[in-house]
């Protein structure tokens, strides 16, 4: 397996440079018109990099004291810095305990249930003592991390979580250390993950309408990550968790890559002009909502009656010009894609690996758009497109076999076209290679989606309430990520021939 190299990504062909955090906050806040309540994981085998990777930070530089300094973390993980969670009572509960006891530790939590086990830690459902506030706590054995050279990966995940403030990304409430463990206190999603939810659907696949809902929310989360210079590298249904309100949240950032990125605003072509791209639709103009506060004062039915797709009456339609084209004022497009990032790491899940990772050619942000295509394919068809008889066969299928669609179920041409545009083996020809999520949002598959109000849409399914108080506490904390819990060890492959 190849060791990773420190990537430096940049976006140099911008017409107007903007502050990363400022613009990311604008896009994130455009989804906060409603404030639905929001409260880990099974997994396929991952391929992990052999060594630790150096990563440039877009949030703040790492220091050696970060591993054990909770006060440093708490200054970043607070409701003040995360407006999407500003009214969350869990912030107040955490702060009350911290103020009363001078800090936060494992003894302040009651571990109720093991939710899942990943490569670097075990996730538990935990209750903050005496508060009825529930969290997902990721517990990592520091000795095991050090022996397996995973300390930097754990640190990178924590730093990424500290940076995030988005409706479809996790909230890190706190981080603390014990003599043996490193713990991340995050929000709990009682709806499980999309993999489990898909298994319960007829035919073990989602309808196209349901799939569109989920991938739209994932796309907005990925767009935000790329704005921050974060390449996710681990998108799959197991890592998309379902909140209690039915909306989703990405999880598991231990394979993510951090790089530098420049944000820019570029002028888009007039939608009524002859030079319009065939894949562009009216929703490409949606970023105007970021700049127009009037969007917030829409009629309540637009948000809470909720419709995912717009349905306009004849009198609501936009006026046409003399030649019959709609009058649409050219509006700026947000471009935030770390196109210059490069890594030689061999990481990911076999069925989701992009060809450039397998071939060891070095990869950048385009790998996320490949996995986005695989993700959509799996939601629609109930399986991934290149799965072979074994892991090795799967990898060779990804590199050498063409994309094929099954005869059943029947999906729309737009859905197949989007998947086909994303699953292009040459990354430079892949949809979203240059302009990221902006290109995908303009694809006809998403025609009619009001991107600013996705958060207000009705989810396809609302999880059944879970009686958390009836759960018995976990007697002991297991040695997270130790060899004793790595039951899928045989599924981990190392490749020295790519």
Swiss-Prot record:
Residues 1-82, 310-329 are annotated as: Disordered. Transmembrane segments: none annotated. Disruption phenotype: No visible phenotype under normal growth conditions, but the quadruple d6pk, d6pkl1, d6pkl2 and d6pkl3 mutants are deficient in lateral root formation and mildly agravitropic, have fused or single cotyledons and narrow and twisted leaves, form few axillary shoots, exhibits basal shift in root hairs positioning, are almost infertile and impaired in phototropic hypocotyl bending when exposed to lateral white light. It catalyses: L-seryl-[protein] + ATP = O-phospho-L-seryl-[protein] + ADP + H(+); L-threonyl-[protein] + ATP = O-phospho-L-threonyl-[protein] + ADP + H(+). SMART domains: S_TKc (SM00220). The keyword Zinc-finger does not apply. Residues 7-27, 39-61 have a biased composition (Polar residues). It is found in: Cell membrane. Pfam families: Pkinase. Keywords: ATP-binding, Auxin signaling pathway, Cell membrane, Kinase, Lipid-binding, Membrane, Nucleotide-binding, Serine/threonine-protein kinase, Transferase. Interacts (via C-terminal PIF domain) with PDPK1. Component of a complex made of PINs (e.g. PIN1 and PIN2), MAB4/MELs (e.g. NPY1/MAB4 and NPY5/MEL1) and AGC kinases (e.g. D6PK and PID) at the plasma membrane. Binds directly to NPY5/MEL1. This is Serine/threonine-protein kinase D6PK.
